[in-house]
Regions:
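N-terminal Sec-pathway targeting helices
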Residues: 5-26
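Flexible gly/pro/ser-rich segments immediately N-terminal to CXXCH heme-c attachment motifs
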Residues: 136-143, 167
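The canonical Cys-X-X-Cys-His
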Residues: 145-155
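Conserved structured core elements
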Residues: 10, 142-145
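Short, solvent-exposed loop/turn and secondary-structure capping segments
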Residues: 157-166
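Short Fe-S-cluster ligation motifs
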Residues: 174-184
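Extracytoplasmic c-type cytochrome modules immediately beyond a signal peptide or single-pass transmembrane anchor
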Residues: 31-139
Length: 184
C-alpha cells in the first residue's frame, strides 16, 4: 500500500515539476523575444528625418552617416538602448506641452531648438522620440530617459546634406532642455 501511494505522489510531483519547468522556459523565451526588437531594427535611414532645418538655420534634404563601420542596426541599438535614466513618466512626456504654448514639448521644432535630433518612428522607437531619448521600464512603469546617444550623436548640415556622426559629441543644450522641461 505504501509503495503504491509513494508512486502516486511521485507521479504528480514529476508532472508538477514538468509544468513549472515549461512555464519557466516560456517566460524566459518571451522575455528574451521582447528585448530582441533592439537588434532587429535595421531601418536603412536609421529613423532620420530627411528634410529639415537645424537650430542654426542650415537646411538639409538628405542624411548620410559617417563611414565608421556602424550598420543601421548598430546605430539604432545605440540610439535606443536604455541606460536606466528614468527621467519622467513616459505617458506624461508624450503629451507634455511647452510652457508658453500648446505645442508638444517633444515636437520636432522644439527638440531641434535644443540641438537634439528629431526622429521618425521605427521598430525600436515606435513613438519617434529624438535620438538619445527612450522609453524605459522600471518597477512596472514606463519612463522617458536618456541613452548615450543623447550626448554622443551629432549632425552637421552642409550644402543640403546632414552628416550624422554616431558616437560624436552632440551639439545639444541639455541645461536649457532640462530647465524648459521643468517649466513645462
Amino acid at each position: 500500500m505504501y509503495a503504491k501511494s509513494a508512486k502516486y505522489y511521485l507521479y504528480w510531483i514529476k508532472r508538477l515539476l514538468l509544468i513549472v519547468s515549461v512555464l519557466i522556459v516560456i517566460w524566459l523565451v518571451s522575455g528574451i523575444a521582447l528585448q530582441l526588437y533592439e537588434f532587429r531594427d535595421s531601418d536603412p535611414d536609421r529613423g532620420a528625418i530627411m528634410n529639415g532645418t537645424d537650430k542654426f538655420g542650415d537646411r538639409f534634404s538628405q542624411v548620410t552617416y559617417l563611414a565608421q563601420g556602424w550598420s543601421a542596426s548598430d546605430s539604432l541599438w545605440f540610439y535606443n538602448t536604455s541606460q536606466g535614466s528614468n527621467l519622467l513618466p513616459y505617458s506624461f512626456f508624450l503629451v507634455l506641452e511647452q510652457s508658453d504654448s500648446s505645442a508638444l514639448f517633444r515636437s520636432d521644432e522644439n527638440i531641434d531648438r535644443y540641438g537634439y535630433l528629431p526622429q521618425r518612428p521605427t521598430i525600436s522607437n515606435p513613438d519617434g522620440l529624438p535620438v538619445g531619448m527612450v522609453r524605459d521600464r522600471y518597477q512596472g512603469k514606463n519612463y522617458m530617459g536618456f541613452t548615450c546617444a543623447a550626448c554622443h550623436t551629432t549632425q552637421i548640415n552642409y550644402a543640403g546634406t546632414g552628416m550624422r556622426i554616431d558616437g560624436g559629441p552632440a551639439n545639444s543644450d541639455m541645461e536649457s532642455f532640462m530647465i524648459d522641461l521643468a517649466n513645462a
